[in-house]
Design a protein with these regions (language model features):
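Basic polycationic patches enriched in arginine
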Residues: 2-3, 12-13, 18-19
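N-terminal glycine-rich phosphate-binding loop and ensuing alpha1 helix
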Residues: 24-102, 106, 128, 164-168
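Residues at the starts of beta-strands that form the adenosine-phosphate
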Residues: 29, 74-76, 122, 149, ...
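Structural beta-sheet core signal
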Residues: 32, 78, 152, 181-182, ...
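Conserved beta-strand scaffold positions in the cores of enzyme catalytic domains, especially
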Residues: 52, 123-125, 179, 267-269, ...
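Conserved beta-loop-beta/alpha segment of the NTase-like Rossmann-fold superfamily
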Residues: 97-100, 107, 113-199, 233-235, ...
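Catalytic-core segments of class I nucleotidyltransferases/pyrophosphorylases
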Residues: 151, 170-174, 203-305
């Protein structure tokens, strides 16, 4: 695994203004912004990264990585911060544990801790040295991404789907190129929680955007089509992130940079097939645990009985 700090990367700059015009090059790389403090889940996140919170028996970050693997991603880029050692350890082998499981012939357990791991050389880390917004976190990965399209996955957004959400997006990207984001309709009173598309054309599955607005008030929101934490982005977005302009909340917003690419890069929102859980919210996290437990053949029957026995 490669560990690269922002200082190490700063001496090696890429001229992002000289990009090719091929809008449908294969998406090989994914960025995972995982530098957040997880304050909404204190005290659980005092000593554990929020991305390591488990849904049933698997941490959120593993769900995101497995989704990326199913979409053909080959290079996994984690933008971390202080106190993320457990996350990095999760993507490394644990020889003592694996040896113990092997000695005890715990075949299923060995598979559970090794089968999904990216191969050596497929994982890179860089640091976001201060919390300056999602756009800044993505910008920190610029030299690792280079001059090619890339995905961004926010582990807080867990998607339950027959065809993984990012796989659906990659298939759509092959059709339309440019930027593709996963979107869902939300109640108008909730628009101030999300980035919202200003829609030019909408066929019910795919919406072509003419603009984006970050967390608009309901009365001025151009639509109710909100972006969730799944993106496929053209590298031109780095040209605008490079300007380090502050937006909503005084942070460098990814939405603002994406909006500026519209006109030079196609921009579409895909209504993905599946159910999204906001695991950055306690109720959403608990909801996900219930649904994913009921999906498990080894747990569903007993867990359903446990739910029926609850006295409220």
């Amino acid at each position: 695994m490669r560990r690269l700090s922002n200082q190490m990367l700063s001496g090696r700059r890429i001229n992002f203004s000289r990009r090719g015009t091929d809008m449908t090059r294969r998406v090989r790389k994914a960025v995972f912004p995982v530098g957040g403090m997880g304050t909404r889940f204190l005290p659980a996140t005092k000593a554990m990264p929020k991305e390591m919170l488990p849904v049933v028996d698997k941490p959120l970050i593993q769900y995101a990585v497995e989704e990326a693997q199913a979409a053909g991603i080959e290079h996994f880029i984690f933008v971390t911060g202080r106190g993320k050692g457990a996350l990095e350890d999760h993507f490394d082998h644990a020889p003592q544990l694996e040896r113990l499981l092997l000695e005890r012939r715990k075949t299923k357990e060995i598979e559970a801790v090794t089968s999904w791991m990216p191969k050596s050389g497929q994982v890179s880390y860089t640091r976001q040295q201060e919390p300056m917004g999602l756009g800044h976190a993505v910008w920190c990965a610029r030299d690792l991404v280079g001059d090619e399209p890339f995905a961004v996955l926010l582990p807080d957004d867990l998607v339950r789907a027959k065809v993984p959400c990012l796989r659906q997006m990659v298939d759509t990207y092959v059709e339309v190129g440019g930027n593709v984001v996963a979107v869902m309709d939300v109640p108008r009173e909730h628009t101030k929680r999300y980035g919202i598309l200003d829609v030019e054309k909408d066929d019910g599955r795919l919406a072509r955007a003419k603009g984006l607005v970050e967390k608009p008030d309901p009365e001025v929101a151009p639509s109710t089509l909100s972006i969730i934490g799944r993106y496929i982005l053209h590298p031109k977005v780095f040209d605008y992130l490079e300007l380090q302009q502050r937006g909503a909340g005084g942070e460098i917003q990814l939405t603002d940079a994406m909006a500026k690419t519209i006109g030079s890069v196609p921009f579409h929102g895909l209504r993905f097939e599946g159910q999204r859980f906001d695991c950055g919210d306690k109720v959403g996290f608990l909801h996900a645990n219930v649904v994913f437990a009921l999906d498990r053949e080894d747990l569903a029957s007993d867990f359903r009985e446990a739910l029926r026995s609850i006295q409220i």
